[in-house]
Amino acid sequence: MPNISDSFRTLAIALLFLIGLFGWLLPMTLLLAPFGKHTEALRHRLMWRACRFAARHLPGTKLEMKGEKEAEWQRPSVLVSNHQSSLDLLCLLMLSPRLVVVTNQRQWRNALYGAVIRRLNFLPIGMGFDAMQQQVGRLAKEGYSVVIFPEGTRSRNGRLGRFHQGAFALAAHLKLPLVPVVLHGTDRIFPKGSHTFRRGKIEVEIHPAWPAPDNNEAAIRETRHKMRALFMERLGQGGNGKVCYSDTNLRGYSPPEYISDTHSSSHA
């Protein structure tokens, strides 16, 4: 049962969202869209500034960044992140004005939100791997990085779901580095299925880039398992503690059975 402060906080955030979307972001994006490539960078910068402002000024929340100064956003890459809340996208889009996101079909078809993201080069997950590879490759040549949630959907209980292969296969095919971004706390502030925002702290943890895996099934699978091991360890879901993060290569990497998908709570 939400308390009064949570209800007022939710109302304040909803008003800020509506004012930002209808009063600024949507009109500016639609007005600039007819000018095509000439205003593409400006549209992305508008989204970046809006998300950066919103993430830093959410009522009742504290934002902490780790690894932001060391991040190399000028280098196109595949960002992979855990998915716990609708707030996750806000926390990722604030990182750089040169990000595009692989999003689900429901968001892509939304009359209002979809109108914005289609003009920001976001990609629908249903387009298929070959088309996705072609589009991501084109965007990478233009200096953009792509954000993918390898779980495919938000977790209902905060537990890390199984990682699907797509992000790692894309990185392998296009020879793009992988950047792990671990999100903490968004599930406690606005969990899946909730209609109210709670007080809390959000941590955005940006890790050094991993090299692209070799373009073969075994290497892609191994990178997927290693990446999930990193996220499990950083989220404190490492079970018996055999996986200890030390560097991008996960020294002391545990056997696959340790990071099996038995804790998965959601599937794409």
Model-found features: residue ranges?
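Catalytic core of membrane glycerolipid acyltransferases/transacylases, capturing the structured
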Residues: M28-R45, W73-G128
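Hydrophobic alpha-helical segments typical of transmembrane helices
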Residues: A50, D88-C91, L112, G166-A167, ...
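A residue-level signal for beta-strand positions that form part of recognition/binding surfaces
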Residues: K62, P76, R98, K201-E203
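Glycine-rich helix-loop-beta junction characteristic of Rossmann-like nucleotide cofactor-binding loops
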Residues: G67-E72
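Non-catalytic C-terminal accessory region of glycerolipid acyltransferases
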Residues: I4-F8, D130-A268
